[in-house]
């Protein structure tokens, strides 16, 4: 294709609203354009990239045995009310009414719709297992859409849903989809990691997330350097520390005027933060609960929700703290609270000896408290965020490291979460009704495009992996409008490369060479070939791989061999 025949509206300046590199470069390169907050138009160049992602995803879904269908984006409210998610999903669910005053929503996901389809159409165990998928537009009414395609309100997603007679059948499909996802992201040329994950609002049992590794990623990815353990921060655990063994000191209440934070407490008392048991007051499903952590640890609200079996866990407000304990925040502790409040401690907090904690009165703290002697041990659970250097929970030798990642895929074992609430039953081999078990599997197709840019760029622009590039080869024809020889040679090379199976963009624009080179670098085509009177006079082509800054002169045989070699690298 000729550059003069395709619309590529590049920008010299970075738009002010673009924060992430992917947002900046996709706008500057003419791949997308903003319509409204969180809404983007895919321009011709961007759509070529998007279609490449879709093609790879579709091929691997078909290879795994999943069957493609297409469901409505507008969904009736009664399905969501039936599953219990109409209220649970919150304001991110865009709700609307039709002219008959019936309630609907724009689908952020399709568990309810596919469940309704299954209960209408699947009646016998002979029809199972079955796995359906679609590639379709979704909508989530994000409160603050930002980062371009990374967190928009409208996005394109591949979502798949499988139905089974039992868990062993689900496990087989789950593994097949897990492996299909690995193939998808490998084929797309992305560096990624699959990690154990929490199921969140989707519900269900086992799940894994797939993260593209990038410094700009919103998510913390925890992994062991010695074994294959990996999890996201919400799920990650560490091997418990051994309890401290010290001679108990005399407990004492001391004045700590105005000392509210752990750091202030440690400095005032002359102790490390690890010698403090801090109290975090939360409201779990409307009930006040006291959570205890070691002073140098951070509360993981997702873990707390699971430990408390609560759907909603919020930090207590100052007035709630005083009402429940008689003390302001910063001075609350587990010893003799004003009211009988449920207490749950993190495992590490129960391993601290001679610790300091709030005394449930303003400007007072305890020091040298010890479990069992001064106060009873409360129930314990894993409540903390792991930290780099923690011991791996799966092996004896490993320690944990933390990297940043961008979530681009998620696979869930839903179990009976939706089949029970929506009554999906089939006749089993004995002729009795049996509840099916489900899995669901998502890939953020449009998000993959942005994530790829976050991983593949330099100060000149995007560096697309071959599998994602809108064109694989860019030919820069210098002064083609003035030199018939350059125009003819560039066109002949274009035709030869396309005959070899490459997708080629021939830059035949009447622009200065510097502008042509800058455009090629910005849009990130993997291979650049320069055709000019100078190189033609030498009987060679000037070649550069986008990932390098090295220009090399090659004859046609060498050029074809170099392209094949570089192309194979991705």
Swiss-Prot record:
Pfam assignment, any one: tRNA-synt_2b
SUPFAM superfamilies per the UniProt record, alphabetical: Class II aaRS ABD-related, Class II aaRS and biotin synthetases, YbaK/ProRS associated domain
Subcellular location: Cytoplasm
Reaction equation(s) it catalyzes: tRNA(Pro) + L-proline + ATP = L-prolyl-tRNA(Pro) + AMP + diphosphate
Alphabetized GO MF terms: aminoacyl-tRNA deacylase activity; ATP binding; proline-tRNA ligase activity
The EC number(s) this enzyme carries: 6.1.1.15
Any one of the GO CC terms: cytosol
One of the protein's GO biological processes: prolyl-tRNA aminoacylation
Top-level class of the enzyme under EC nomenclature: ligase
Domain of life: Bacteria
Keyword terms, alphabetized: Aminoacyl-tRNA synthetase, ATP-binding, Cytoplasm, Ligase, Nucleotide-binding, Protein biosynthesis
Domain comment quoted from the record: Consists of three domains: the N-terminal catalytic domain, the editing domain and the C-terminal anticodon-binding domain.
Subunit text: Homodimer.
Family classification: Belongs to the class-II aminoacyl-tRNA synthetase family. ProS type 1 subfamily.
NCBIfam families, alphabetized: PRK09194.1 (NF006625), proS_fam_II (TIGR00409)
PANTHER family given in the database record: MITOCHONDRIAL RIBOSOME PROTEIN L39/PROLYL-TRNA LIGASE FAMILY MEMBER, PROLINE--TRNA LIGASE
Function statement: Catalyzes the attachment of proline to tRNA(Pro) in a two-step reaction: proline is first activated by ATP to form Pro-AMP and then transferred to the acceptor end of tRNA(Pro). As ProRS can inadvertently accommodate and process non-cognate amino acids such as alanine and cysteine, to avoid such errors it has two additional distinct editing activities against alanine. One activity is designated as 'pretransfer' editing and involves the tRNA(Pro)-independent hydrolysis of activated Ala-AMP.
Name the record gives this protein: Proline--tRNA ligase
Native species: Acidithiobacillus ferrooxidans (strain ATCC 23270 / DSM 14882 / CIP 104768 / NCIMB 8455) (Ferrobacillus ferrooxidans (strain ATCC 23270))
């Amino acid at each position: 294709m000729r550059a003069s025949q395709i619309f590529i509206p590049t920008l010299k300046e970075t738009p002010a609203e673009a924060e992430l590199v992917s947002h900046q470069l996709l706008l500057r390169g003419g791949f997308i354009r903003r319509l409204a907050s969180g809404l983007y138009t895919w321009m011709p160049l961007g759509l070529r990239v998007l279609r490449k992602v879709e093609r790879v995803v579709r091929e691997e879904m078909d290879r795994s045995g999943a069957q493609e269908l297409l469901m409505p984006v507008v969904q009736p409210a009664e399905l969501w009310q039936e599953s219990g998610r109409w209220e649970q999903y919150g304001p991110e669910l865009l709700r609307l009414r039709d002219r008959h005053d019936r309630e609907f929503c724009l689908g952020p996901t399709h568990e309810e719709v596919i469940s309704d389809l299954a209960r209408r159409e699947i009646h016998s165990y002979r029809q199972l297992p079955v796995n359906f998928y679609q590639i379709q537009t979704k909508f989530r009414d994000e409160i603050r859409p930002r980062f371009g395609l990374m967190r928009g309100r409208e996005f394109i997603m591949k979502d798949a849903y499988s139905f089974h007679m039992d868990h062993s059948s689900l496990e087989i499909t789950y593994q097949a989809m897990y492996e299909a996802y690995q193939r998808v992201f490998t084929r797309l040329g992305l560096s990624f990691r699959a990690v154990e994950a929490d199921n969140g609002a989707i519900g269900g049992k086992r799940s894994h997330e797939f993260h593209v590794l990038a410094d700009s990623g919103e998510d913390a990815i925890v992994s062991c350097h010695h074994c294959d353990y990996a999890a996201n921060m919400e799920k990650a655990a560490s091997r418990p520390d051994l309890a401290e063994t010290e001679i108990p000191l005399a407990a004492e209440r001391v004045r700590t005027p105005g000392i509210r934070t752990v750091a202030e407490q440690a400095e005032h008392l002359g102790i490390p933060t690890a010698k403090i048991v801090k109290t975090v007051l939360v409201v779990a499903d409307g009930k006040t609960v006291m959570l205890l952590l070691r002073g140098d640890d951070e509360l993981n609200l997702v873990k707390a929700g699971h430990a408390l079996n609560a759907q909603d866990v919020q930090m207590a407000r100052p007035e709630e703290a005083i009402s429940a304990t008689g003390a302001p925040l910063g001075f609350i502790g587990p010893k003799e609270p004003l009211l009988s409040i449920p207490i749950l401690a993190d495992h590490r907090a129960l391993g601290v000896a001679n610790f300091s904690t709030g005394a449930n009165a303003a400007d007072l703290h305890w020091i040298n408290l010890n479990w069992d002697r001064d106060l009873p041990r409360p129930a314990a659970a894993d409540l903390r965020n792991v930290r780099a250097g923690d011991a791996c929970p799966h092996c004896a030798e490993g320690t944990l490291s933390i990297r940043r990642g961008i979530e681009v895929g998620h696979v869930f074992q839903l179990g009976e979460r939706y089949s029970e609430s929506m009554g999906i039953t089939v006749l089993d081999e004995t002729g009795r009704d049996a509840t099916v078990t489900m899995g669901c599997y998502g890939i953020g197709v449009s998000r993959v495009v942005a994530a790829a840019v976050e991983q593949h760029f330099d100060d000149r622009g995007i560096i697309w992996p071959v599998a994602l590039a809108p064109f694989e080869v860019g030919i820069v024809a210098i002064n083609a409008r003035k030199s018939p020889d350059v125009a003819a040679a560039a066109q002949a090379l274009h035709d030869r490369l396309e005959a070899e199976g490459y997708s080629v963009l021939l830059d035949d624009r009447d622009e200065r060479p510097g502008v042509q080179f800058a455009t090629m670098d910005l849009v990130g085509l993997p291979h650049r070939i320069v055709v000019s009177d100078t190189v033609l006079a030498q009987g060679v082509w000037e070649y550069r791989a986008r990932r390098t800054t090295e220009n090399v002169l090659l004859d046609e045989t060498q050029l074809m061999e170099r392209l094949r070699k570089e192309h194979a690298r991705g």
